[in-house]
């Protein structure tokens, strides 16, 4: 999947949890990605993060650090 689309999706998820005002938002975002994203999508977004993570919301970027690196 194109990194731009994954970034947009991750940022939408981050915006939802940010609006909830939860201190645990990064963990909640990571949990959502683990539950609902295909492992290939997680692999692709992590590759994007490793390449600099352009366009990612800071909250989404924090969540990416919590994702397992192997599925």
Give the location of each predicted region.
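Short, charged early-sequence alpha-helical segments and their helix-coil boundaries
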Residues: 41-67
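N-terminal glycine-rich anion-binding loops that anchor highly charged ligand groups
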Residues: 36-39
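N-terminal intrinsically disordered, cationic/polar leader segments
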Residues: 4-7, 27, 57-58, 64, ...
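Mid-chain, well-packed structural core segment of small domains
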Residues: 22, 28-30, 71
């Amino acid at each position: 999947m194109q990194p731009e689309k994954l970034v947009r999706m991750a940022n939408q998820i981050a915006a939802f949890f940010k609006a909830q005002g939860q201190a645990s938002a990064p963990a909640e975002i990571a949990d959502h990605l683990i539950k609902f994203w295909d492992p290939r999508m997680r692999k692709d977004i992590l590759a994007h993060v490793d390449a600099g993570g352009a366009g990612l919301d800071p909250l989404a970027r924090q969540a990416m650090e919590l994702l397992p690196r192997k599925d």
